[in-house]
Amino acid sequence: MLLIGASCSDDDNTLSYSTGAVQNTELKTILVQRGYTFNEDGNLLLDDLANNTTTLDLSGTQISTDALAELSMFPNLTDVDLSDNGYGPAFDFAKLPEQITGIDLTGNEIYDYDNLVSVVVEENGDETVTNLHEITKLYLPETAKENIEDLVRFYRQNKEAITAGTIDMKMTDVDGNLQTYTTLRDVPDANLLTYLQTNFADLFNGDQIDLSKHLGLDQKTKELLVAPADNVTNFEGIQFLVENPYWEGAKISLYSAGEESIASMPNIKVGKFITQVILQNIEVEDIDLSNATDLRSAWVQNNPALQKLDLSYSTIWGQGDKETEGNGTYGSSLMVLGCPILKEIKLPEKNELKAYRIDIECLDALETFDMSNVKMVAELSIGDLNKDFNLVYPELTIFYSEDGYAGTYFACSENTFYRESTQAFLKANYTDIDPDDTVRRLGYTSSLSYDKNKGCRWRTLLNKQK
């Protein structure tokens, strides 16, 4: 770290410069424009301007967070405005010099606040929270309302100082106005509010979720199921349960009021205890599965906003034995239906994956999805896809099913049937198999899951090609 307040003098001992030199050219340009002076080596002239600088406005400059450590060249700087700099989704407090205790992060899209606090959780659930950076002022963007892991714990740890005004902690509202930070969050949809109050009452303070509260044992592991009959059209507020570090439910199943009523939902980050995610008729731009290491099943249907679905973080999906993966209840499953702008699907990067079900249909924008490392799948359904998509089929080597009839039941749409890769897949696993082979590789079905896609009679079409 650069030495704070250290300086060096020129030969006539009349000028003093910072020991640390600026390395970031963007930062140097900004500071020169503000009237600061540097020598040819990049050392800051410690004149009255530099020595009297206690606050520095870098808002709207888009300055890289990697340059922030160089601000330690200012001997008396304690407060920096970093608003509207395009930061996000994370901000790392470790990049700030220790001397800076006041920071304005408003106008950025930051969800995670790394190295603000450290948290040690005991076996009984008790937490020890330690501040990693001294803070006297913390102004936060509206997106900070989503963060529980860092900010709520910081707030709880420093509540006395915040209440007394020793720490000035504020957060902008949806209109961009600074408000006193609070752990209370609204649930706008009355039906969702009723559901959450009924099933997760421990989180509430009146009609608001209080992020500082913990869930009791009976609610801590309760599964999240919002059914169509619950008539939810806005899932704002659900993230405060899904991302709550004190909720350990294994399943998330969210359905809108109906197929003709697409519900809105904020982006969510799924926790490490989740094994199943179902989202139907819900518009959400991002489903972050980076912590979902136990995820075994994902079903996303009718999502007009999702562009990427990444299951690669799971240490469970497709990695069981053939008996487990061939079971309809316990086997790995992926269903992605009716997501018109989805571009990418990723599976775990293992040499051999086994699954119970893979079903992809009506994905008009799909560009990337490689199934070649899938060596066993009990049910494979491929509907209409982007016509320019390079469809890479599973390279099947394991043929197992509980009914003993066929290793893989296969269904496809007519458009998919005529793809070259489908013809090659059928040739390798159905048309050209050895008649003496006792293993039936492909079983026939013409049924697809998605009502906007029609399965074809691919056996009939094969016979017509003879």
What are these regions (language model features)?
Residues S59, S83-D84, D104-G107, Y139-E142, ...:
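Per-repeat beta-strand-to-loop junction in leucine-rich repeat
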Residues G88, F93-E142, E344, K350-F417:
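Ankyrin-repeat and related helical/solenoid repeat scaffolds used for protein-protein interactions
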Residues N51, S72-P75, K95-E98, T130-H133, ...:
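Inter-repeat linker/turn residues at the boundaries of leucine-rich repeats
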Residues C8-E70, D79, E109-Y111, N115-S261, ...:
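N-terminal capping/linker segments that flank leucine-rich repeat
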Residues Q62-S64, G86-G88, E109-Y111, K145, ...:
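Canonical position 11/12 of the leucine-rich repeat
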Residues T55, N76-D81, T101-D104, E134-Y139, ...:
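Conserved LRR concave beta-strand detector
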Residues L56, T65-L71, A90-L96, Y113-V119, ...:
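Canonical leucine-rich repeat
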Residues M1-A6:
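Sec-dependent bacterial lipoprotein signal peptides
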